[in-house]
């Protein structure tokens, strides 16, 4: 929901957590351990769809079906306003393709505050999950993702390694080569240059 409690992770904490885990992963585990947020980020740097609705430009592809046949727009929105119908009465494809569901999906992009639309990491974030858009922007516009500060920190932090991995992939090489590149850079060594676009 839109309530922050003493048990909620703070935006800055979330960003530090993601950065800390990423730093460990990018130096030791690329190609061995797959972290959904990192895979989605790499997809953004390569220019592919994220594979994670949180970071997609629009929502609506991940409906939720209840045991009684009730269908809702998303698992974060199992509530009356987002009830699409019941599959025992209406075909699933019709409900998923309904104007209501299409509007739900497009609203993710259409309701982005200006702060988000002008953000340098929008290509990777797209405002995050609409369920978390209950904060206000620095200029007071509603609709900012509560975790924005953390995501901005994270996506800024991973920019160089992501660019390296994206360029490796574009060259037909493996993304896990980033581990050796970063290790050599840390030691001040040089190696075969990787074009970073």
Regions found by a protein language model. Give the residues of each.
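Residue-level recognition of short, well-ordered coil/turn positions
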Residues: 29-30, 100, 173
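Residues embedded in well-ordered secondary-structure elements
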Residues: 52-54, 108, 137
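Acidic/polar loop patches that form or flank catalytic/metal-binding clefts of enzymes
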Residues: 30-37, 72, 104-105, 127-128
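Generic detector of well-ordered alpha-helical segments enriched in charged/polar residues
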Residues: 15, 19, 39, 43, ...
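Radical SAM enzyme core and accessory elements
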Residues: 68-71, 79-82, 111-197
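Generic structural "secondary-structure junction" signal
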Residues: 55, 86-89, 94, 106, ...
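Membrane-interface junctions of multi-pass transporters
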Residues: 50, 78-121
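Radical SAM enzyme [4Fe-4S]-AdoMet core and its adjacent flexible, acidic
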Residues: 1-54, 58, 64, 76-87, ...
């Amino acid at each position: 929901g839109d309530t922050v409690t003493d048990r909620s992770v703070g935006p800055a904490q979330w960003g530090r957590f993601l950065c800390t885990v990423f730093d460990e992963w990018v130096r030791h585990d690329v190609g061995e351990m797959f972290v959904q947020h990192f895979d989605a980020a790499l997809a953004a740097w390569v220019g592919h769809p994220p594979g994670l609705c949180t970071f997609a430009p629009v929502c609506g592809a991940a409906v939720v079906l209840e045991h009684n046949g009730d269908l809702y727009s998303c698992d974060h929105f199992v509530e009356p306003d987002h009830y699409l119908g019941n599959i025992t009465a209406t075909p699933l494809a019709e409900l998923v393709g309904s104007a209501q569901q299409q509007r739900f999906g497009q609203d993710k992009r259409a309701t982005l505050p200006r702060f988000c639309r002008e953000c340098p990491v929008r290509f990777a974030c797209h405002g995050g999950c609409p369920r978390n858009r209950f904060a206000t922007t620095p200029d007071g516009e509603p609709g900012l993702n509560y975790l924005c500060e953390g995501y901005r920190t994270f996506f800024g932090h991973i920019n160089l390694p992501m660019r390296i991995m994206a360029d490796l992939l574009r060259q037909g090489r493996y993304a896990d080569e980033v581990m050796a590149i970063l290790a050599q850079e840390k030691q001040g060594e040089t190696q075969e240059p990787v074009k970073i676009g």
